[in-house]
Amino acid sequence: MMTLPFVAKGQIGDHRNTLSIGVNGGYNLTTVRFTPKVVQNMKGGFAGGFTMRYTVEKYFSTIASVQGEVNFAQLGWKEDIRTIDNQPVINAITGVAEKYERTINYVQVPFMAHLAWGRENKGANFFVNAGPQFGFYLGEKTSSNFEFANRNTADRANSVAAQDTMSVQKKFDYGITAGLGMEYAIPRAGRFQVEARYYYGLGNIYGDSKKDYFGSSNFGTITIKIAYLFDIMH
């Protein structure tokens, strides 16, 4: 019976108390899942901000942490305006191929579980991040080379265009994010990371009731990022 406390202690893993902070930056590739469908290419945009991570435990070979970030992110969509023959749609007024894209800026706040395997404080480890993410709308900007009233509707294979004149209606975004990455730690120099992350939006940017035009309008975002962290408590 006297051995039970020692067995229990071994089962819960080795406690950690490491707090790391730093910065991150990268590039977003985003589409919006519109229903009815809007044909798009991925829209690029900046992503970057601040990272905080608290390492709580090492359980066997798994290093367990919680990680939070506050990031500025450019999302949106870029329309692929084509004919039924997959050719660019030429505007009758301007004589050039029609182009339209929308940039929507957010402050994004992910809260994630961070699980890593490998070297903890010197060398490389591989990690996964996963958890909820919340987005707070800052503003939006449209880039277009044609007037909406003068768009070439006759030649478009995809006739859905209501989104071109609609501002974002729902200013709070939320969803699930997950990523895979690698970290390299150098004592007294810091921790260097590279990560690929995916965000699936569960909220819509437009109303989605039966009376609304779009049934869905949620984000899907691939992010490639790098980060630098340093320990302030160990």
Task: Report each predicted region and the residues it spans.
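Short glycine/proline- and aromatic-enriched beta-strand/turn motifs that initiate or cap beta-hairpins
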Residues: 9-53, 169, 231
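Short loop/turn motifs that connect adjacent beta-strands in outer-membrane beta-barrel proteins
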Residues: 11-18, 57-64, 118-125, 186-191, ...
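Predominantly the C-terminal beta-signal and adjacent terminal strand-loop region
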Residues: 12, 16, 173, 178-234
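Residues on the lipid-exposed face of transmembrane beta-strands in outer-membrane beta-barrel proteins
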Residues: 23-27, 48-54, 72, 109-117, ...
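Extracellular/periplasm-exposed beta-strand and loop segments of Gram-negative cell-envelope proteins
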Residues: 31-43, 75-105, 137-173, 204-221
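Transmembrane beta-barrel architecture of outer-membrane proteins
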Residues: 43-49, 63-65, 104-110, 125-127, ...
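Acidic/histidine-enriched, beta-strand-rich ligand/metal-binding domains
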Residues: 73, 77, 104-105, 116-127, ...
